[in-house]
Amino acid sequence: MRAKRTIGLLMLTLSLYGNASIQVLHTASEVKSALPAAQPGDTFVLADGNYELSWLKLSCQGTDEQPIVVQAQNLLGAKVIKSGCITLENAAYIEFYGLDFDMSATSSFFKLQGAHHIRITRNRFRMSVDKEGQTSKWILVGDIWEHDTCASGYNRIDHNLFLHKSDGGALIVIDGAHGSPGGISVHDRIDHNIFRGNSPRVANEKETVRIGVSDLSMDSSYTVVEYNLFEDCDGDPEVVSVKSCCNTVRNNTFRRCLGTLCLRHGFNNRAEDNIFLGEGKTAVYEEEVIGCGGIRVYGKDHTVSGNYMEGLTGYKWDPAIALTNGDASNSVSTSSKHFLPENVLVSGNTFVRCISTLEVGFTNNEKYSKKPKSCRFEDNLIVADTQAVTMHTAMTSSNITFSNNRIWLTGNGTVGMSYTASQFTLLSACPALPAIEDRIMTDQNAGPYGSEDEDQPTEGLRGTDTTANGKKYFHNGQIVIVRGGVRYSLLGTRL
């Protein structure tokens, strides 16, 4: 039976890729022998079972039209176990599809060093905590540290399930090369993933996603983080930490996350159309109550627009919107200090019954003395039963302006500042709120089993994946290939 399946796979693959080969692999030794010698168009199918891959280093390269594919025969049926790391050094156009990583303590599941056009898709990731002080970065995208330039870029991490990270270290890191002049990975995409559980809380270095690092913060990364679900990601005050320029974080759902999406370093970033749901969650950390926050901003020329925030429980560092003071002026310095918020536009957002909607000028016990500059709070809708706006220090129009905002106050709600009719319109009834039900990310539209509309093109590893001949997509739990207008399963069975 196994031979027949192998023959069927071989015939199908040859019809799609010409001279490319396909191999069905059954043991870790077969995998470690076959993958380093991969050629463009090769497909490696891992049969159901356990694979101890240990420390596997790959430098093979596919092409745009003939990527190298490493995939499970059945979705999540091939399990990678024990300790190890897949290092992709100067590799290109490789796709890892449908694997189950259930490993003991290790430094990383994947480490991309100068790799480009790598796709990590529809996998599940879990790691045990085996020792005190354990740290890991589950997926690290960048280059060899001392290189002068960064060759990494155009990688995609999508439709994965990341479960219960319980050790130290950030989960996904977009990094780069740290030589002279150095550089950051560019045009990477993190989308349609589920991040479920990241705890316990620590003071620093446990972000769920981090884009950049202080010494590369003036580099433009152009990373897009979109359509992800973050649930109970409490490990770091910054759930998503942006530490570079020209990135976009959009259409994500944050549920019960004790922290914020933080534009921590860099300029010209965008946080758009995200959903933040606090659901009443709080906790105690270092004898202080912490809550679920929204977006905290440092640096200049950022846009925060179209976000929906409901029931958020954070304040001070973690209100719905935090524009704290800074301890440094904006410059091209790569200092790890907190640049003051400057020319930040907060517009078109909806805030519903958050403990604290907007806080401006928090000084961190007088450590941050530089006030926000030329920020705007415009066209926002607020429903509040507490004080909506908190000014920690006196502000003028040179610091922040307000215009065309609407607010409905219930219970003990107040605006929290003196205002004019052009700044806030006080509503007499509950306004119509944006419909968010179809925008919330769930297991049905994210993660390994998340659906994709097969008739809608999806920007992917090779540009646009469609149902054209030879293209592969996911449908009803199966890997599907289209040939001659007819759909086939991976093993060549007509659907």
Segment roles from a protein language model:
Residues 23-29, 45-54, 58-109, 119, ...:
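Right-handed parallel beta-helix/beta-spiral solenoid domain characteristic of secreted/periplasmic
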Residues 414-463, 468:
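Surface beta-loop-beta hairpin patches that serve as ligand-binding interfaces in beta-rich domains
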Residues 55, 83-88, 102-119, 126-420:
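Glycine- and acidic/polar-rich repeat regions and solenoidal domains
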Residues 1-8:
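Bacterial N-terminal signal peptides that target proteins for export
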Residues 8-17:
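Bacterial N-terminal signal peptides
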Residues 451-485, 491-495:
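Residue-level detector of functionally pivotal "anchor" positions at catalytic/ligand-binding pockets or at interdomain
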Residues 18-22:
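Boundary at the C-terminal end of the N-terminal hydrophobic targeting segment
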